[in-house]
Every structure is written in structure tokens, then in C-alpha cells.
């Protein structure tokens, strides 16, 4: 059988504010895992989600594994 590429892949989203802020009280930035369809969204995913470290809704960017 031929190998087929999966259209759905698991990605990691990281808080934009926590990752850029080096003076944060928390050593790690907030992260979410989710899935995206490679055919529908070939570019990097950007979502607005709640950050438990910042205590507000912030922008989350897709990062490399």
C-alpha cells in the first residue's frame, strides 16, 4: 500500500505575550494543543484564546514542534 499524508496534523499554540515577556512571574508560557487541516489552512494558525498566566484573552501563534 502507498503511504498517504494525513490531512489533519496536531499543532501547538503558544501565547504571544508570555513568550515575548522575559520578566514574567511564570517560567513557562501558556500553550494549547489542537488540530488543523493542512489543506484548508496551509499557513500558520493564529487564534485568540484565554491565557491563564496573563489572565486575559491573548493571541496564540502556531509554533514548530
From Swiss-Prot:
One term of GO molecular function: structural constituent of ribosome
Keyword DNA repair tagged: no
Pfam families hit by this protein: Ribosomal_L33 (PF00471)
One of the GO biological process terms: translation
Keywords: Chloroplast, Plastid, Ribonucleoprotein, Ribosomal protein
Main subcellular location: plastid
Annotated PROSITE patterns: RIBOSOMAL_L33
An annotated GO cellular component: ribosome
Compartment(s) where it occurs, according to its Swiss-Prot or TrEMBL record: Plastid, Chloroplast
Xref: Gene3D superfamilies: Ribosomal protein L33
Family: Belongs to the bacterial ribosomal protein bL33 family.
PANTHER family: 50S RIBOSOMAL PROTEIN L33, CHLOROPLASTIC (PTHR43168), LARGE RIBOSOMAL SUBUNIT PROTEIN BL33C (PTHR43168:SF2)
Protein's UniProt name: Large ribosomal subunit protein bL33c
Amino acid at each position: 500500500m502507498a503511504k498517504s499524508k494525513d490531512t489533519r496534523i496536531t499543532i501547538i499554540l503558544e501565547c504571544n505575550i508570555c513568550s515575548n515577556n522575559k520578566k514574567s512571574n511564570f517560567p513557562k508560557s501558556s500553550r494549547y494543543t489542537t488540530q488543523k487541516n493542512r489543506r484548508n489552512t496551509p499557513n500558520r494558525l493564529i487564534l485568540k484564546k484565554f491565557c491563564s498566566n496573563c489572565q486575559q484573552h491573548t493571541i496564540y501563534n502556531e509554533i514548530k514542534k
